[in-house]
Amino acid sequence: MAVKIKVTLVKSPIGYSENQRKVLKSLGLGKMGSSVVHDDTSSIQGMIRKCAHLVAVENVAE
């Protein structure tokens, strides 16, 4: 059973680099307050680290 995490966009990416905005889009986050649930993989963790100052992460019980 894979561990799931919920990623929520809590800060606007306006004024931050284009790379960080692309990472947010690839995570599936568009608008402030939007949330997505992903498997906790190393690639997702790397994307979260790139924009950690813009998102909130929490574990989801499956």
Curated annotation (Swiss-Prot):
Single Gene Ontology BP term?
A: translation
- Enumerate the Gene3D superfamilies for this protein: Ribosomal protein L30, ferredoxin-like fold domain
**Keywords of this protein's UniProt record, alphabetized?**
Ribonucleoprotein, Ribosomal protein
**Single GO cellular component annotation?**
cytosolic large ribosomal subunit
Q: Which GO terms describe its molecular function?
A: structural constituent of ribosome
Highest taxon above the source species: Bacteria
* Classification via NCBIfam families: rpmD_bact (TIGR01308)
Instruction: State whether it acts alone or in a complex, and with which partners, per the record.
Output: Part of the 50S ribosomal subunit.
Family listed? Belongs to the universal ribosomal protein uL30 family.
**Protein name according to UniProt:** Large ribosomal subunit protein uL30
Annotated source species: Desulfitobacterium hafniense (strain Y51)
